[in-house]
């Protein structure tokens, strides 16, 4: 059995778990997420805890039980608490402005970048150089943050660009004459 799958997922109060024919549906205050059921993994719900057991003893079934447990755990956390990614803009003239579901970025290009948020992700800009992304799906929030960062990744000489809060950019030394 997978070491990850050995630990059950505790479902907090206010989170509903429904088993469908093809998917596990998790509902909470932050929305609803569904997880497609895999034929190699059996999921049981007892006393507010979800347990994951591999249907057979193959390596793939063990791996899938651990993967399923990790993904469902993230879904339970997402619908109850939510996920947040923070980005900061470092550079002269680099600005961000949120207008509803649209994020306008000025990153030193000749044109402004207009990024539309996907369903389930909200954006806020507490200051012109800070972006806060929130949502219930960890994968989607992380993907959006990575796409925004990719518009102008931090460069290694001055550190200018879009970076995650707390990210350490390894700086290079300038060429010497």
Curated annotation (Swiss-Prot):
Check the record and name the Pfam families matching this protein.
Answer: Ribosomal_L6 (PF00347)
Source organism of the structure? Neisseria meningitidis serogroup A / serotype 4A (strain DSM 15465 / Z2491)
* An MF annotation (GO) of this entry: structural constituent of ribosome
- NCBIfam families from the UniProt entry: L6_bact
The GO biological-process annotations, alphabetized, read as: cytoplasmic translation
Q: Which PROSITE patterns match?
A: RIBOSOMAL_L6_1
Query: Superkingdom of this entry's organism?
Result: Bacteria
Q: Name one GO cellular component term.
A: cytosolic large ribosomal subunit
What UniProt keywords are attached to this protein's entry?
Answer: Ribonucleoprotein, Ribosomal protein, RNA-binding, rRNA-binding
> Which family does the UniProt entry place this protein in?
Belongs to the universal ribosomal protein uL6 family.
Q: What does this protein do?
A: This protein binds to the 23S rRNA, and is important in its secondary structure. It is located near the subunit interface in the base of the L7/L12 stalk, and near the tRNA binding site of the peptidyltransferase center.
SUBUNIT field: Part of the 50S ribosomal subunit.
Q: What is this protein called?
A: Large ribosomal subunit protein uL6
């Amino acid at each position: 059995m997978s070491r990850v799958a050995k630990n059950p997922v505790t479902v907090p109060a206010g989170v509903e778990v429904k088993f469908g024919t093809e998917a596990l549906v998790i509902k909470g205050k932050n929305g609803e997420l569904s997880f497609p059921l895999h034929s190699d993994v059996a999921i049981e719900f007892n006393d507010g805890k979800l347990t994951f057991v591999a249907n057979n003893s193959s390596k793939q079934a063990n791996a899938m039980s651990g993967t399923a447990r990790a993904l469902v755990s993230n879904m339970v956390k997402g619908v109850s608490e939510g996920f947040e990614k923070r980005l900061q803009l470092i550079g002269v003239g680099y600005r961000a402005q949120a207008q509803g579901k649209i994020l306008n970025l000025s990153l030193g290009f000749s044109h402004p970048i207009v990024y539309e948020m996907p369903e389930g992700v909200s954006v806020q800009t507490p200051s012109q150089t800070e972006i806060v992304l929130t949502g219930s799906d960890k994968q989607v929030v992380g993907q959006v943050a990575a796409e925004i960062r990719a518009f102008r990744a931090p460069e290694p000489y001055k550190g200018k660009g879009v970076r995650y809060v707390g990210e350490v950019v390894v700086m290079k030394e300038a060429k010497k004459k």
